[in-house]
A protein has these predicted regions:
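Conserved ATP-binding N-box helix of the HATPase_c
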Residues: 21-43
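Short beta-strand/loop element within the Bergerat-fold HATPase_c
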Residues: 43-53
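Acidic ATP/Mg2+-coordinating residue in the GHKL
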Residues: 60
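Glycine-rich G1-box
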Residues: 63-64
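ATP phosphate-binding glycine-rich loop and adjacent ATP-lid/helix-beta elements
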Residues: 68-99
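C-terminal beta-strand of the catalytic ATP-binding
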Residues: 99-106
Length: 108
């Protein structure tokens, strides 16, 4: 899969707690797998920043979701619930934009 990836990060990843690093890694891995397997995207952008916690925005120019039912990305939502995090689908297609928020450190 030839997807052009752009990363824009103002986070010092080494300064994050082990729980935050692990959760962020799992979320990124799952989102990347979904893009590769399902999206038919040509490009993907990842933005990481702090805004009263850790914010990850994941955007691709693929086919998106046919219908948003609330059950999409269930494993990510489940993992984020353990660290008081949340996931929001800002745009379901053209581009697909997903925003993930989690408190720094988490509670796990």
């Amino acid at each position: 899969s030839d997807i052009v990836l752009t990363v824009d990060s103002s986070l010092d990843l080494d300064s994050l707690s082990p729980v935050s690093q692990s959760t962020l890694s799992m979320v990124l891995r799952e989102l990347a797998n979904n893009v590769i397997k399902h999206s038919q995207a040509d490009s993907c952008q990842i933005r990481l920043r702090r805004d009263h916690g850790i914010v990850l925005e994941f955007e691709d120019d693929g086919c998106g979701f046919e219908e948003v039912t609330g059950q999409e990305l269930h494993s990510i939502r489940e993992r984020l619930s353990l660290v008081d995090g949340d996931l929001e689908i800002l745009s379901q297609s053209h581009p697909t934009i997903i925003r993930v928020y989690m408190k720094e450190g988490g509670k796990a």
